[in-house]
Structures are given as C-alpha cells and as structure tokens.
Amino acid sequence: MTIKAISVDIDGTITYPDRRLHEKALEAIRLAESLGVPVMLVTGNTVQFGEAAAILIGTSGPVVGEDGGALSIKEGKLRKRVYLTNMDEEWILWGELKKRYPEALLSFSMPERKAGLVVLRTVPVKAVRELIKELGLNLIAVDSGFAIHIKKPWINKGTGIEKACEYLGISPKEVAHIGDGENDLDAFGVVGYRVAVAQAPESLKEKADYVTTKPYGEGGAEAIEHILRKFGYLPEEKT
C-alpha cells in the first residue's frame, strides 16, 4: 500500500480540548508537508474556517468543509470553492424542531453554510433523529461531539475526500485519515489507512488500523508521525 496524502479532522484531533491548535500537531503537519505529503484539513466546520486554518497552518491539500459538503481547492495563489449540495428539507426540519424545542439553537456559523444545518447540543441528537423519521425527510443527524450536523445522507467526509482526491489526481485508497468523532466513520470507509485519536468513540476505534496512545492534538501529532514512519517517509523508530 502507498500513502500519498494525509487527511485530518481539526477539532479534537489537532487541537487541545478547548479547540486551541496544538503545537505538536502543527509541527507534525508541517513535517509531513516538508516531506512532500500534502495534508487535507477535513472538518464539520465551514469551508471558510477550514481555509483560514489551512493558510495559518500551511497545508497544501484541498480543504473539505461542512462534513464533506463543501471543498476549497488551491489554484496557485487563489482558492476555488465547490459545493456538493444545497439545503431544502433541512429548513423544514429546523422549523419543526424549533417549535417543539424552543431551546434549540443553530450554530453561529450558519450564515456561511450551504450544505447542511448545524444545531448546538442543547437538543438530544436522538430527538433530532426521531423528528427526521416522523417527518419522512431524507436527512441524517450526526453528532460530531461538538454539535449535531444535519445533512443529506450522501454528504459526508468520505464523499468529500473522494472529490478532493480527484483534484489531487490520486485514489482515496492512497490517503490516510485521522479523526476522533462519529463523523469520521465515512472517511474511514473510503481511505486506505485509518487512525483514531485516543479519546475517539469505540465505534471509530473498532474501524481503525491504529489508535493513538495520546488524546487530542498530541494524539494527532502521534498519528501523523506514525503514518510517516509506517509508509517510509521517516525511518522506523528503534525499539
């Protein structure tokens, strides 16, 4: 197996628990880039957030935002945004959800979003899923650990990575993905190598080829270095 790119979740994977970027993860990402391995930031957050992070961190790969619904492709000094869907039934769900649960709140990032709703965790994800079923909507609700992402069933990190790979000219099987949440499962389904960070749910760890010993950003750094060593970009550590 050959790995030509690394895709990595942001929140909880290359950050501290409070979402500050972890220094060790930053160093590891820049090490990968210096070795010719493009890093793709893959997030449930907005594509604009991902773009800003990519610029500050220094990643060269595409940005996958909105859980796979939006991409940002680097073209020279400019970036092109690609949206894989739009919202319709999502707003029907939101109207009914707000009626039944007045405490329901949308993410402050909604004005920038085009591919799905993000509801804060003031409402149980189970209640959202039950309402989707009751209304007969073709939507799913995924708990990222930070918020509830409501979207079309075919919009996920896996489809976003597949689209990003078209622009890179590589197969998704030549990508190693690192994540820490339920919304990373679809990414695990399309890539060639899978790493779960230590605090990830068991559902993700069960599908991983490697689980880090350290959590959060320190675990993200461990994951990147593990991938670089396993696939020959760095020498194996002596035991």
From Swiss-Prot:
EC number: 3.1.3.18
Active site positions, chain numbering: 9 (nucleophile)
Record InterPro entries: HAD-like_sf, HAD_sf, PGPase
MF (Gene Ontology): magnesium ion binding; phosphatase activity; phosphoglycolate phosphatase activity
Enzyme class: hydrolase
Positions contributing to Mg(2+) binding: 9, 11, 180, 184
Pfam families assigned: Hydrolase_3 (PF08282)
Assigned GO CC terms: cytosol
Catalytic activity: 2-phosphoglycolate + H2O = glycolate + phosphate
Signal peptide from the UniProt entry: none
Keyword terms of this UniProt record: Carbohydrate metabolism, Hydrolase, Magnesium, Metal-binding
Sequence positions that bind substrate: 157
Domain of life: Archaea
TM segment ranges: none
Keyword Secreted: no
Cofactor(s) listed in the protein's UniProt record: Mg(2+)
Role summary: Catalyzes the dephosphorylation of 2-phosphoglycolate.
Family listed: Belongs to the archaeal SPP-like hydrolase family.
Record PANTHER family: HAD SUPERFAMILY HYDROLASE-LIKE, TYPE 3 (PTHR10000:SF8), PHOSPHOSERINE PHOSPHATASE (PTHR10000)
The protein's name: Phosphoglycolate phosphatase
Organism: Thermococcus kodakarensis (strain ATCC BAA-918 / JCM 12380 / KOD1)
